[in-house]
Amino acid sequence: MTLWRSLQIAGLVAGMAGAASATEVKGVLMDKACSGKAEVRVLSTGIEGGMIVAEAHTRECALMPACQKSGYGIFTYDNKFLAFDTAGSRKALEAIKASKKLDDLEVVVTGEIKGDTIKVESLKLL
């Protein structure tokens, strides 16, 4: 094998290793405006928020103009909110409008996570 061919193969392998890979995330679809209600808070009276609040979030609320305008994201089973990119929010809105579910909008999202945002490749309501 020539030196040039070896360098090409090494470059290809290095490029593939540096490529971002898609991650599958499961949770509940919510709008950003309401996501703060689901954040877990420890109070003197007990714990508030969390997945119970996220699952109770309604389709009707998610379709309100202010909630649509805020964009969407996923509240994960480890109690974190990942905001969708603009294209992901459009996909989420289409899925919510097409769904007959009234609440508990469980979803599987595949995409690239960067910080607290996910660039959505695919989204499926369960």
Task: Identify the function of each model-found stretch.
Residues M1-A10, G18:
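Bacterial N-terminal signal peptides that target proteins for export
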Residues S21-L126:
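OB-fold and OB-like single-stranded nucleic-acid-recognition modules
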